[in-house]
Design a protein with these regions (language model features):
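Conserved strand-to-loop turn within each blade of WD40 beta-propeller repeats
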Residues: 35-38, 76-80, 117-121, 160-164, ...
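Loop/turn segments within WD40 beta-propeller blades
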Residues: 21-29, 66-71, 106-113, 150-155, ...
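WD40/WD-repeat beta-propeller blade N-cap
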Residues: 10-17, 56-62, 97-103, 139-146, ...
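WD40-repeat beta-propellers
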Residues: 41-45, 83-86, 106, 124-128, ...
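Solenoidal tandem-repeat scaffolds enriched in leucines and small polar residues
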Residues: 102-202
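Beta-strand-rich domains and repeat architectures in extracellular enzymes and scaffolds
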Residues: 10-39
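A short beta-strand motif characteristic of beta-propeller blades
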Residues: 6-10, 50-55, 92-96, 133-139, ...
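Terminal intrinsically disordered, low-complexity extensions flanking WD-repeat/beta-propeller proteins
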Residues: 225, 259, 265-267, 275-278, ...
Length: 328
């Protein structure tokens, strides 16, 4: 019998959703933040998509957003030449970090004491959040605007991507360790601490590299241009989305395409697995986020598995469906 994937649709944004990030698992569950060109990043309950609040204060498109591990702080990167740090519990703005150009990416260290930023001025900046008045440390070397910058190796190193280059930096010496060059634009980058894996997308390719050495591990080709990909926490599956509005799910070990789903009405800009691996979230040009089950038919969050005998009295269709009770 077929199992029907029924995504939860999270509305509220008015422009394309360009970035999203999950927190770690906290005593209150886990959380999801989304960055949008409407300039209003939103915080949601991660497993249901329920809206918690909107961070108000940016005066331009928000290109990047992240949460610290315990979801007490949020950070956002925007076209108004600022990065902002927020109290994710109260929604209050804690600090504004002025830049000289559009900011595209933000990332907290594990202890939440430092914030890494990158953007159109080609510089990486490291802010000490306990000394907001202090000038940030700056790392130069990129030759085009920085799209993504991430702490790695327990914050001892930094990974960053510009148009066609991924670079690995040593935090202590602020110097470049190694770089990777691509023949087309790098569209996304994800770092998996368990196993030190780096996921890079460019063109139709989804490539996996060692985050320590940048050596290649494996790569897959998708049927369409891919904008983002995410590896399951247990490294069983990966999901990817891009220009053809579809989400693809692959077996990480064999590279076999397991499923593909169309739910968005525009290109997919970002996709990430939840920290427990039970779902993945996607953000699109259509202004929505959607939450998808990793294992269709499992009762989890707002999804409840309805068996054929339970719906026989309502209709004669015997398709198994994993149906959300309400829309977020």
């Amino acid at each position: 019998m077929a199992m029907r994937q029924t995504p939860l649709t999270c509305s509220g944004h008015t422009r394309p959703v360009v970035d999203l990030a999950f927190s770690g698992i906290t005593p209150y569950g886990y959380f999801l933040i989304s960055a949008c060109k409407d300039g209003k990043p939103m915080l949601r309950q991660g497993d249901t998509g329920d809206w918690i609040g909107t961070f108000l204060g940016h005066k331009g498109a928000v290109w990047g957003a992240t949460l610290n591990k315990d979801a007490t702080k949020a950070a956002t990167a925007a076209a108004d030449f600022t990065a902002k740090v927020w109290d994710a519990v109260s929604g209050d703005e804690l600090m504004t970090l002025a830049h000289k150009h559009i900011v595209k990416t933000v990332d907290f260290t594990q202890d939440s004491n430092y914030l890494l930023t990158g953007g159109q001025d080609k510089l990486l900046r490291i802010y000490d959040l306990n000394k907001p008045e202090a000038e940030p440390k700056e790392i130069s070397g990129h030759t085009s605007g920085i799209k993504k910058a991430l702490w790695c190796s327990e914050d001892k190193q930094i990974l960053s991507a510009d148009d066609k280059t991924v670079r690995l930096w040593d935090h202590a010496t602020m110097t470049e360790v190694k770089s990777l060059n691509f023949n087309m634009s790098v569209s996304s980058m994800e770092y998996i601490p368990e196993g030190e894996i780096l996921v890079i997308t460019y063109g139709r390719s989804i490539a996996f590299h060692s985050a320590v050495s940048l050596d290649p591990i494996k790569s897959f080709e998708a049927p369409a241009t891919i904008n983002s990909a995410s590896l399951h926490p247990e490294k069983e599956f990966l999901v990817a989305g891009g220009e053809d509005f579809k989400l693809y799910k692959y077996d990480y070990n064999s590279g076999e395409e397991l499923e593909s789903y169309k739910g968005h009405f525009g290109p997919i800009h970002c996709v990430r697995f939840s920290p427990d691996g039970e779902l993945y979230a996607s953000g699109s040009e259509d202004g929505t986020l959607r939450l998808w089950q990793t294992v269709v038919g499992k009762t989890y969050g707002l999804w409840k598995c309805v068996l054929p005998e339970e719906i026989a009295s309502e209709n004669s269709d015997s398709i198994y469906s994993s149906t959300p009770e309400v829309k977020a």
